[in-house]
């Protein structure tokens, strides 16, 4: 039998970064694009490329007897060598911009990750996005309060001072819509949405705008789990059921945190399917928005 490691979907096998020939092929591809004139890269899931070897079993941290795969990424040695090598062989000689999707970084290490001669030009600030999360699953997560959100913003501004700048986000393709996640229900209106947008635009750093934010997009009201395509959402739905939530409660939890909230077809106008397609879209169109009538 043959096996391969995948930290995400089974159709997304992890590459073996321990192989220097593989790393050189990656750098070759990056430089090909940089030579074409692109300005830089958004580097996804980069903290996942280094795993402690040899592979071993880890203690269960959930009721199903399994453990969160992220547990193997805690204190692996050698990650910085890979990141520095990539920087030296690709973005640095091209004077290119790079922004890293970096989770779990200790504040004392920020100077190694952002700056003129760091691994990346900037990294995304996920401090407020992960606030309230636990390893148990979405059913155990807590939505950050306005005061907690403010504290996250203040902390990030302080730790980056004199070092470099973060790339600030409210949402992206892996997050629920920010207006539904961060704003209290009474503030989920036009004024509240504009205030949230203005606030992160006024922070020091580089604001990344995700499609739909210009409309003040909110979460989609998914009628059933069948309307959700995201594999992690479906997994979390089953986990909710296993810990005792009923189907209605499980759907409520998953509908709030699902990545599909940010992946519904974009509404270009007020025609069928928002003008996104004349066919059948892979996800339902959020019924709250019809751009032609906004």
Segments the model singles out, each with a brief description of its role:
Residues 1-294:
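Active-site and adjacent substrate-binding regions of carbohydrate-active enzymes
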